[in-house]
Regions:
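Gly/Ala-rich phosphate-binding loop of Rossmann-like dinucleotide-binding domains
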Residues: 17, 21-22, 156
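Glycine-rich FAD pyrophosphate-binding loop
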Residues: 21-42
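Helix C-cap/helix->beta junction micro-motif
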Residues: 23-25, 77, 108, 160
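Flavin (FAD/FMN) cofactor-binding and adjacent substrate-gating region
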Residues: 92-160, 165-166, 172-178
Length: 184
C-alpha cells in the first residue's frame, strides 16, 4: 500500500515527490506524459526567484525557506540550479509594486539600491525607460533553471525509493474513507 500518490511530475509534483520520499514515505508519482515533454508550465530557460516580495510579508518566511531548499537540492544533486544575479523591480514610485518592494526590503533588512531611470539604463543598457520610472534593485534575487530542477527532483526521488509512472493518465479518484482509489 502506498502512503502518497503525487499526480503530475512538473515543478511542484516532482518537488513534493522528492521530499516525501526523502522522509521515508512509500510514494508514487504519476505523469500523463513522457518524462520529457512541453505540456507543462515549468518548461523554458528560467523562472524568477526573489526575496523582496511586493505581495506581502506573509510570503517572506516561505521565500527564505525556498532559498534554503534550493541550495540543499543543488548540494545533493551536485549541480547549480539557482543563479543569484540580483533582480530589479521597475515602476513609478507611487505604484504599489514599487512601494511594497521597497518597504519589504527596508523592513526585512534586505540589501537594496534605489535607482532612477538614468541609473537603470546605465547599469542595464537593454532598458530604455521614461523619466517617471525608477527601480529597486535587490541583491537577493535571480533565477532558477526549471527543467534542471524537475530533473533533479525526479532523479533524487527515485534515489530515495520513489516510483514514477510516465504516460499514465489519472482518469478519476475516489475517497473510500480508509483509503483513496486512483483509476489510471
Amino acid at each position: 500500500m502506498l502512503d502518497v500518490i503525487v499526480i503530475g511530475m512538473g515543478a511542484h509534483g516532482s518537488a513534493g515527490l522528492f521530499h516525501l520520499a526523502k522522509k521515508g514515505l512509500n510514494v508514487l508519482g504519476l505523469e500523463q506524459f513522457d518524462q520529457i515533454h512541453n505540456n507543462g508550465s515549468y518548461h523554458g530557460l528560467s523562472r524568477i526567484i526573489r526575496m523582496g516580495l511586493y505581495e506581502g510579508d506573509a510570503y517572506l518566511p516561505l521565500a527564505k525557506r525556498s532559498f534554503e531548499l534550493w541550495r540543499e537540492l543543488e548540494k545533493e544533486y551536485n549541480e547549480q540550479i539557482l543563479y543569484m544575479t540580483g533582480i530589479i523591480n521597475i515602476g513609478n514610485k507611487n505604484s504599489p509594486i514599487y512601494k511594497n518592494t521597497l518597504n519589504s526590503a527596508i523592513k526585512h533588512n534586505l540589501e537594496y539600491t534605489e535607482m532612477n531611470n538614468q541609473e537603470i539604463m546605465s547599469k542595464f543598457p537593454g532598458f530604455e525607460l521614461p523619466n517617471d520610472l525608477n527601480g529597486v534593485f535587490l541583491k537577493e534575487g535571480g533565477f532558477l533553471d526549471p527543467e534542471k530542477a524537475v530533473k533533479a527532483h525526479t532523479q533524487l526521488a527515485i534515489k530515495n525509493e520513489a516510483m514514477i509512472n510516465y504516460n499514465e493518465k489519472v482518469l478519476s479518484w475516489d475517497d473510500k474513507i480508509s483509503h483513496i482509489e486512483v483509476l489510471t
